[in-house]
C-alpha cells in the first residue's frame, strides 16, 4: 500500500477525495505515482512520490498548477496514473479544479523568478532565462567528441535494467527517465552537487561544497529556444528534459568550463563551439557563489 495520507488525497474516479482513515483501507498498484503538495524543502521526485513544494503554501499559483498538470500528463504518457495528496483540502480542490480546465493552465506563463526553491542565497529562487546540464570532465570530453548531449541510456549503452538497478539510482527512477537529458535552471546548484557526489562516491559535506568545491562543466541553453526542440518535454519536475540527444552546435548557448580544466578540455572542443566557451576561475567561497559567476 502507498504511504499514508496526511489529510486528504484525490484518487481517480470513482473514489474522489478520501480521508486518511479511508485511505488505510485502500490498495494501489505499482503503476501509480503519488503527488504530495506542501511546504517541502524543494520540488523533487523520489521513490514514486512527486513532492511539489509551493512557494506560498497553502496558496497555489497558476504556474504551480501547470507543473502539476505537466507531471500528470507525462506520467500518463508512460502508463502511470497519479493520486494527489495535500494537508489542505482547499488547496487540493483548487488544484483539482485546475486539472479539469488544464488547457487554460498549460498556457500559464513561466515567472522570471521561481521562489519555491530558495537553496540559492543570492537570487532567492530559480532564474528562468536559461537551463543547464552539468557534467564531469570525463563526460565533457565524450560530449565534445560526439558533439551531443546524450541521455543516460544512449551514453552508457547498457540495458535500461542495469541503469535502474545501479546504486546511483537512489531515487528509484523508472525506465523512461533514463531516455532523457535532464536540465536544471541556470543558477541551480543541483548539477554540481550531483557531479561531486558521483566523484566522491558519497554525499558532499560542507567542506566539499565550500573550500573543497570543484565545479563541473556547464552547458547552458536559452529556455524559450530549447522549448522548441522537437524532443523537449516539460514533466513538471525539471524545467524541461530532452529525449535521446541535443546537438550542441544547433542548441547550446554557452559552455562554462573551470579555468584549471582548460588544458585538458580545449583539445577536444570542436571549432564550431570555440566561440561559445567561457573559462572561469573558481575563486568563489562556495557552490552557491560559483553558480552566480
Question: What is each of the regions a protein language model found here?
Answer:
Residues 2-117, 122-125, 178, 190-293:
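Conserved NAD+-utilizing ADP-ribose enzyme module
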Residues 106-154:
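Short, extreme N-terminal leader segments that mark the start of a protein/domain
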Residues 52, 58-62, 67-70, 140-198:
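Glycine-rich loop/turn
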Residues 134, 182, 218-220:
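Conserved hydrophobic/aromatic beta-strand scaffold that supports enzyme active sites
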